[in-house]
Amino acid sequence: MLIAWPDRVHCCEIMLQEGARVVDAVEMAALNGIEQAVGYAVFGVLVTSDHVLNDGDRVELLRPLLIDPKEARRRRAVSA
């Protein structure tokens, strides 16, 4: 389980039953900041909360974007 916010990063390993879903992993991890997650990914691929996990999967909690990536690039290009 991986959660990476601007002010902190937390990674933990949890053991689940075979057939466990993303939502089961999230509940089991009980990390601070989970309520801010707007989505989930497994190894960088978007998944739903009912996605069945495989042994060794890395579940990532996704945070909301603060700014549109295209707009951020435009701003950096202007200031460079």
UniProtKB/Swiss-Prot annotation:
- InterPro entries named among the record's database cross-references: Mopterin_synth/thiamin_S_b, RnfH, RnfH_sf
Pfam families from the xrefs? Ub-RnfH
The record's family statement is:
Belongs to the UPF0125 (RnfH) family.
Spell out the protein name for this chain: UPF0125 protein PD_1376
Whose protein is this, by species?
Answer: Xylella fastidiosa (strain Temecula1 / ATCC 700964)
